[in-house]
């Protein structure tokens, strides 16, 4: 094993997932001077490999959850443990969609870490074939046009919102600040990737689960079942 190689999601297990969640929570708590994160304490060789990851924060209020921040990296610029620590801080304090996380919210925050495979461009002769090629519940998508437009949606997102493949493509275009049908434009690059999700079951990191994107339940269906 060569230190610095890209982490493969097949290498990851519950123990690694627990470390990643712990790193993310400690990184956030450190900003409030409630904990100290020393990455040298995490000397597992897999964590020292370069990695791609996103950290998602959800705020739990009674029986509902809402997004509180999500930031990540799709370039292998640092070891996985460092990527997760940086993404956690950014999700908590630098996501432009939200105000910075407050100390009194920590007890309501569920942390989710998604480790990604390297994105690969999808090349097709006929752009209308794209919805037949991508797989909801398996693929995450990146849409890029030039240097000004880029949007990414994680594999779990279309499952949560009950999207089909064409809607998934359109929503990723919108995320890139492009028209919903941008995926039909040959100058637009479409990339896909896979991911494995580690998630806290409650806001303290004491218990985590491993989630496949295909296992994510549609939030719309859950809402309908409550009526």
Curated annotation (Swiss-Prot):
Stored SUPFAM superfamilies: AMMECR1-like
Annotated InterPro entries: AMMECR1 (IPR023473), AMMECR1_dom_sf (IPR036071), AMMECR1_domain (IPR002733), AMMECR1_N (IPR027485), AmmeMemoSam_A (IPR027623), Uncharacterised_MJ0810 (IPR023472)
Pfam families: AMMECR1
Source taxon at top rank: Archaea
Residue ranges the record marks as coiled coil: none
All copies of domain AMMECR1, residue ranges: 15-209
PROSITE patterns from the UniProt entry: AMMECR1
Stated name of the protein: Protein LS215_2104
């Amino acid at each position: 094993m060569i230190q610095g190689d890209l982490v493969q999601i097949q290498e990851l297990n519950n123990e690694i997932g627990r470390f990643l969640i712990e790193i993310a929570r400690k990184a956030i708590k450190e900003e409030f001077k409630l904990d100290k994160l020393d990455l040298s304490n995490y000397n597992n060789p897999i964590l020292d490999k370069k990695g791609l990851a996103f950290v998602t924060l959800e705020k739990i209020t009674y029986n509902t959850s809402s997004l509180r921040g999500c930031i990540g990296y799709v370039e292998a610029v640092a070891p996985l443990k460092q990527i997760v620590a940086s993404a956690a801080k950014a999700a908590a304090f630098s996501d432009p969609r939200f105000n910075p996380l407050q100390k009194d919210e920590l007890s309501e925050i569920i942390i989710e870490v998604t480790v990604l495979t390297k994105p690969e461009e999808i090349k097709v002769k006929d752009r209308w074939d794209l919805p037949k090629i991508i797989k909801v519940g398996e693929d995450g998508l990146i849409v890029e046009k030039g240097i000004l437009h880029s949007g990414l949606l994680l594999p779990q997102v279309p499952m949560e919102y009950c999207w089909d493949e064409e809607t998934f493509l359109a929503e990723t275009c919108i995320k890139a600040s492009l028209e919903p049908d941008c995926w039909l434009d040959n100058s637009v690059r479409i990339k896909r990737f896979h991911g494995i999700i580690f998630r806290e079951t409650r806001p303290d990191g004491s218990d985590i689960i491993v989630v496949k994107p295909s296992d994510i339940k549609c939030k719309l269906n859950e809402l309908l079942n409550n009526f």
